[in-house]
């Protein structure tokens, strides 16, 4: 479709106008010349809707007979798979082609019909997207929940019985306690210190932990994001190369199956290959179920594709490491390991659970004993089960509550979405398909509707505004269920159960209704002036406008260059609708925040540490930073307390001295216990990493020794 115009004739059954992509004319010329010399032509594009559409376009370009069986497809680029595909050619699936055409035209209609309204309301650089706008809405609504979240104090309570059994508070008055928020109940718990509790239940249960399913596109992207730090687009780019193949000892080998799939199905041949490998490497007892379970709610599965797996399990990551670059090795290792794990036996274990009670207060403990390690032999889940010997405890036994371990904390707002969790959310809502997840995320980032903070999505001001206006004027486009229903209807077109032109007509008719309503509303909206409580040099209130970088204040005199950015200033939609915004105090407060807040920590040179905020949140900086260059990081838990406003202030000064003295004392004890580096003899230092604090040798980079900090 052309880049500069809609390219769809809405008055002629939505007939698309296809153009040759710039620079690809020579490729078409070569294809035509080669086709004249060929005895037989096979169309072997990717085995999905996009691939089917490409095959159809090539067939049209080469003037091939659509009734001829010239379409072949395979899920892996191996000699055997290709030969098998050539033996079983088929006709081009026109229903699948129409499904892909309908998707592209739907996206065009939304983009070209709705975006002009956004240009008028917000800025010429904005645009609407059928699926990306719904993804933006999900991110914005989550941010609203985070902003409106009010932390609640709670207590995590553990009881230490007879000096050795560490049990969690379980129930009070037959109600399960997840987070204890009632201070009266806490006092009631404290009263039972040094009292006897009786074991009212002790039982052993047999448990099974099944291995995870084979990978599909969404779970591949999620795992690559979580474990490797790959973006969705990077994951697909590296996977594409592994699928296309690598030269290994002079032989070209496709290493993985097709990576755009929403199926976790595995072929019988691949299962048998895995069974032979597992029997040889681990023994027959480690063989998994012949027919491992698949998810029942995989409603979005388009076809009979396999999950993502290695083409040959015998090509272990270690065997082919030298032929892969760093990223290829990481991703292949992930895919290979997950496939192996999925075909291994379940882990079997016994769980001993016991409950102690006194006066309707219960504590619960559990310990696990692995009976058969199964897939745990190769891979243990991050949240490992507590493993140990079963204590000799039976019903009727009595234990003394020696000590209470009470930790005060505050409830946390919902976590922002990462690339991994956004893909998971889109999939669970039925929005998008394997081929679109990466492009949805890329579009949001390129349009600057979202930004990444600590690998999590935060909507930008311009993103919020786009979401707000689309929600207001085109609620159907922004409706998650409506978007998911469209995806289902596209699947129906693919299966031949729905006519693609009927689908487009229904959609476009409804879209036009909203457009008509929108035109009049937009004109009224544009006539409105939103004044601020700041008076400009001309004596008139500055007015709010929206530009490339979000909201800003400007003079009512068009020739004036008086502008004030509103970045970081929260303005409610109610204020904007009222035509008057109050931002003067907020701007002053923001300026104060940039200047910093005094703390009670004084350095040896007499300089005071100032609390400041940067790209990664709060940090401490000397008020004489230009002279002494002193800057300190703030531990994550302390940052949270600062954000929740739970650290005391005296005479306008933030009291952090006592907290940091305690941390420094703890760190000194850790370093004393650690001693010198056993490799080079130099002292250790404490560093903060992705998983928390760790010990690192000060001899770095010559000595790269690191150690975990032993828990007390």
Which role fits each region the language model picked out?
Residues 176-213, 394-397:
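Metal- or metallocofactor-binding catalytic centers and their adjacent structured scaffolds
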Residues 46-48, 123-127, 204-213, 223-231, ...:
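Conserved short loop/turn motifs at secondary-structure junctions
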Residues 61, 115, 186, 262-712:
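Basic, low-complexity terminal or inter-domain segments flanking catalytic cores
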Residues 211-224, 250-258, 413-425:
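Short acidic, hydrophobic short linear motifs in intrinsically disordered regions
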Residues 80-159, 205:
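C-terminal or mid-to-C-terminal helical accessory/interaction module adjacent to the motor/catalytic core
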Residues 243-257, 447-455:
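A short, conserved structural fragment
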Residues 30, 34, 53-61, 81-85, ...:
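Alpha-helical scaffold elements adjacent to nucleotide-binding pockets in ATP/GTP-utilizing enzyme cores
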Residues 1-104, 113, 180-184:
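Intrinsically disordered, low-complexity regulatory segments
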């Amino acid at each position: 479709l052309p880049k500069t115009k809609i390219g769809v004739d809405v008055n002629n059954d939505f007939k698309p106008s296809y153009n040759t992509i710039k620079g690809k004319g020579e490729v078409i010329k070569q294809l035509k010349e080669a086709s004249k010399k060929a005895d037989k032509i096979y169309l072997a594009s990717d085995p999905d809707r996009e691939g089917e559409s490409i095959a159809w376009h090539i067939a049209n370009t080469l003037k091939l007979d659509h009734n001829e069986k010239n379409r072949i497809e395979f899920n892996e680029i191996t000699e055997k798979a290709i030969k098998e595909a050539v033996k079983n050619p088929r006709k081009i699936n026109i229903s699948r082609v129409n499904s892909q055409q309908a998707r592209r035209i739907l996206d065009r209609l939304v983009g070209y019909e709705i975006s002009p309204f956004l240009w008028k309301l917000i800025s010429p650089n904005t645009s609407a997207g059928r699926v990306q706008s719904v993804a933006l809405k999900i991110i914005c609504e989550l941010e609203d929940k985070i902003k409106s979240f009010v932390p609640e104090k709670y207590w995590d309570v553990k009881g230490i019985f007879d000096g050795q059994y560490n049990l969690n508070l379980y129930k009070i008055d037959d109600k399960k306690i997840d987070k204890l928020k009632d201070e009266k109940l806490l006092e009631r718990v404290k009263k039972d210190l040094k009292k006897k509790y009786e074991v009212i239940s002790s039982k052993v249960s047999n448990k099974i932990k099944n291995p995870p399913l084979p990978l599909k596109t969404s779970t591949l992207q999620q795992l690559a994001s979580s474990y490797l730090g790959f973006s969705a687009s990077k994951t697909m780019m590296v996977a594409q190369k592994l699928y296309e193949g690598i030269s290994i000892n002079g032989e070209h080998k496709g290493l993985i199956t097709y990576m755009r799939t929403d199926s976790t199905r595995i072929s019988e041949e691949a299962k048998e290959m895995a069974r032979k490998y597992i029997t040889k490497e681990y023994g027959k007892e480690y063989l998994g179920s012949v027919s491992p379970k698949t998810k029942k709610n995989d409603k979005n599965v388009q076809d009979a594709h396999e999950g993502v797996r290695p083409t040959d399990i015998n090509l272990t990551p270690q065997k082919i490491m030298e032929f892969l670059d760093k990223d290829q090795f990481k991703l292949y290792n992930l895919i290979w390991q997950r496939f192996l794990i999925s075909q291994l036996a379940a882990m079997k274990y016994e769980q001993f659970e016991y409950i102690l009670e006194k006066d309707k207060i219960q504590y619960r403990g559990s310990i696990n004993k692995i009976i058969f390690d199964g897939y745990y032999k190769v891979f243990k889940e991050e949240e490992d089960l507590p493993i140990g010997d079963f204590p000799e405890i039976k019903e009727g036994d009595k234990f003394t509550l020696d000590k209470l371990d009470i930790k005060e904390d505050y409830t946390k707002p919902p976590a922002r979405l990462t690339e991994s969790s956004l893909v998971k959310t889109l999939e669970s809502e039925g929005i998008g398909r394997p081929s679109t997840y990466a492009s949805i995320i890329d579009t949001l980032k390129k349009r600057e509707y979202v930004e990444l903070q600590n690998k999590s999505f935060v909507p930008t001001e311009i993103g919020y505004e786009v979401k707000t206006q689309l929600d207001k004027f085109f609620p159907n486009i922004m409706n998650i269920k409506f978007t998911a229903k469209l995806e289902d209807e596209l699947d129906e077109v693919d299966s031949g159960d729905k006519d693609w032109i009927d689908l487009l007509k229904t959609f476009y008719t409804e879209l036009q209704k909203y457009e008509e309503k929108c035109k009049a509303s937009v004109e009224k909206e544009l006539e409105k002036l939103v004044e601020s409580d700041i008076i400009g040099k001309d004596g008139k209130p500055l007015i709010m406008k929206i530009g490339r970088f979000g909201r800003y204040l400007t003079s009512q005199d068009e020739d004036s260059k008086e502008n004030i950015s509103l970045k970081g200033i929260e303005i409610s939609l109610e204020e904007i609708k009222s035509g008057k915004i109050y931002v003067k105090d907020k701007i002053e407060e923001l300026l104060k925040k940039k200047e910093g807040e005094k703390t009670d920590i004084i350095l040896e040179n007499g300089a005071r540490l100032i609390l400041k905020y940067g790209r990664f949140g709060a940090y401490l900086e000397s008020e004489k930073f230009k002279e002494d260059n002193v800057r300190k990081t703030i531990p994550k838990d302390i940052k949270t307390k600062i954000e929740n406003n739970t650290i005391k202030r005296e005479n306008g000064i933030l009291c952090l001295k006592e907290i940091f003295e305690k941390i420094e004392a703890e760190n000194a004890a850790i370093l004393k216990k650690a001693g010198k580096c056993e490799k080079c003899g130099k002292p250790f230092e404490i560093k903060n990493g992705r998983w928390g604090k760790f010990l690192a040798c000060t001899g770095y980079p010559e000595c790269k020794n690191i150690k975990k900090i032993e828990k007390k």
